[in-house]
């Protein structure tokens, strides 16, 4: 149930996409490179070298077709947010904990650890099994929120990443604070749990603050975070 199968990838207009954004966007505090091409990711990261926090996602196509570019981007970011299959593909191991450590050390990236280390923090999205955050100062595990009715998981990874990074804005990039990372992951898990209940953005766009807070409080009690 938690394993995605890619039948075909059609890049269409993204095939030759070159990000061109306003000058004031180049001073963004938090930068998230979603699963675009490593070439685009590196371009955005190079233009935002003063960001407090940088993060990226990817998917199988780029691991297979531009591993060098992906490795270059991974050495520039603070946080990588991948699903379990992506972690194991990059880390070249069937154990995601082993793979994550190899990515963070740079061992499994193009050129190896001597070229440079990877991100300081790697978050593994594990579907119904929740998520695991491997941080240089420890490991965080959280279950998924038990959603009674699952409609469509499309976009949950992006919603998860967006909610997680939004919680880091007040921290001004202090990702070394592992408890703040834990709290951000709680918000990310809860937000993604709403997204899975509908197609597209319907559930998120119509979500009321009170309903969100009620589920957040329930999940906090479940995982022992008050």
List PLM regions with ranges.
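Conserved N-terminal subdomain of the carbohydrate kinase-like
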Residues: 1-32, 47-50, 213-226
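Short gly/ser/thr-rich secondary-structure transition/capping motifs
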Residues: 11-16, 58-65
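Short beta->alpha connector loops
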Residues: 35-40, 59-63
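Conserved phosphate/ATP/ADP-binding segment of small-molecule kinases
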Residues: 46-53, 60-143, 149, 178
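Conserved post-catalytic alpha-helical subdomain immediately downstream of the catalytic base
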Residues: 117-120, 145-225
């Amino acid at each position: 149930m938690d394993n995605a199968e890619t039948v075909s990838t059609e890049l269409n207009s993204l095939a030759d996409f070159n990000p061109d954004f306003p000058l004031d966007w180049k001073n963004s505090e938090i930068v998230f490179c979603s699963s675009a091409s490593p070439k685009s990711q590196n371009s955005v990261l190079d233009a935002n070298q003063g960001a407090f926090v940088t993060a990226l996602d990817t998917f199988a196509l780029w691991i297979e077709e531009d591993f060098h570019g992906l490795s270059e981007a991974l050495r520039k970011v603070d946080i990588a947010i991948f699903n379990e299959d992506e972690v194991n593909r990059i880390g070249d191991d069937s154990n995601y904990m082993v793979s994550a450590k190899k990515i963070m050390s740079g061992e499994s990236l193009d050129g190896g650890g001597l070229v440079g280390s990877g991100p300081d923090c790697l978050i593994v999205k594990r579907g119904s099994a929740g998520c695991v955050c491997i941080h240089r100062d420890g490991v965080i595990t959280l279950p998924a929120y038990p959603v009674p009715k699952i409609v469509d998981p499309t976009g949950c990874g992006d919603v998860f990443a967006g909610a997680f990074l939004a919680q880091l804005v007040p921290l001004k990039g202090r990702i070394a604070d592992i408890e703040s990372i834990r709290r951000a992951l709680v918000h990310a898990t809860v937000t993604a749990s709403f997204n899975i209940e509908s197609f597209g953005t319907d559930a998120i766009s119509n979500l009321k603050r009170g309903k969100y807070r009620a589920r957040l409080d329930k999940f906090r009690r479940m995982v022992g975070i008050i």
